């Protein structure tokens, strides 16, 4: 039968291995897979960390935010049972390159915020509450920018027309304005983190990081995305392979040799 977007397919192909480009499948025939031909659980990629554990870690991290305005902002936006919170917990973090699966945005945002929290204790002069809040919310626009059809992830109309940074900024800004007495300096600080987290104008940010907190979130976010690409690449390697083929996200190949048994496991 005719295959639908995001639905499993059965592929008949010829395998070959090119010295330069690596493993290749030349597709001969493709059709929609029948329900008895696949296990949905095997096709549903997800985070390596159990979902319930991530939710517990999220609650614990929000609980460490001392500023009452910032904690209320996080609780309003990310609480379970709210429209924004439920979408944020379920959304993917990307279309292809890293955490491109259900709950991927939660996984990515939480890991960035945890990294920011740890680094804030190392470097002086950083407002930890602002940095952690900005880290948890920096990609919140992706709940509108991406849409999922079955297993397929693509940009929504809003994502194409406006972009995830403006979508996220205005969602957070509206919530800050709805909190009575929310300080204008905190509004500026958190908003700046969201607007600048891509780091450069040519990478899609309307401004570059101008505060310690924004710079920290940008660099940890970039690190998280890069390491997420390594995870994605490694999953696609055959047993025993150490080198990947060229990967666009890394602008090169990835190497997975000389690893300790504990890490390899």
Residue ranges and their predicted role:
Residues 12-46:
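OB-fold/S1-family single-stranded nucleic acid-binding modules
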Residues 98, 107, 118-236:
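Divalent metal-dependent catalytic cores for phosphoryl transfer on phosphate-bearing substrates
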Residues 51, 55, 70-71, 81-85, ...:
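Alpha-helix initiation and N-capping motif
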Residues 6, 112, 221:
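Divalent metal-coordination and catalytic microenvironments
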Residues 37-161:
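Acidic/His-rich, divalent-metal-binding segments that scaffold phosphate/diphosphate chemistry
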């Amino acid at each position: 039968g005719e295959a639908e977007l995001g639905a499993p397919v059965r592929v008949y192909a010829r395998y070959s291995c090119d010295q330069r480009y690596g493993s290749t499948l030349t597709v001969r025939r493709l059709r929609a897979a029948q329900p008895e031909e696949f296990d949905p659980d095997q096709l549903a990629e997800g985070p390596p960390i159990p979902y319930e554990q991530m939710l517990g870690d999220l609650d614990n991290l929000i609980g460490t935010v001392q500023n009452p305005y910032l904690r209320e902002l996080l609780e309003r936006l990310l609480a379970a049972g709210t429209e924004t919170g439920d979408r944020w917990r379920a959304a993917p973090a990307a279309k292809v390159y890293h955490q491109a699966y259900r709950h991927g945005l939660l996984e990515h945002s939480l890991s960035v915020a945890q990294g920011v929290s740890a680094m804030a204790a190392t470097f002086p002069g950083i407002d930890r509450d602002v940095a952690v809040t900005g880290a948890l919310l920096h990609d919140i626009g992706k709940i509108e920018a991406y849409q999922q059809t079955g297993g397929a992830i693509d940009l929504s109309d809003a994502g194409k027309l406006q972009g995830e940074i403006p979508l996220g900024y205005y969602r957070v800004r509206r919530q800050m304005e709805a909190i009575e007495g929310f300080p204008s300096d905190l509004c500026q600080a958190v908003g700046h983190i969201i607007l600048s987290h891509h780091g450069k104008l040519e990478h899609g940010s309307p401004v570059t990081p101008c505060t310690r907190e924004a710079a920290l979130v940008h660099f940890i976010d970039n690190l998280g995305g890069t390491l997420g690409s390594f995870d994605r690449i490694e999953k696609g390697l055959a047993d025993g392979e150490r080198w990947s083929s060229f990967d666009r996200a890394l602008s090169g190949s990835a190497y997975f040799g000389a690893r300790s048994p504990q890490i390899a496991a």
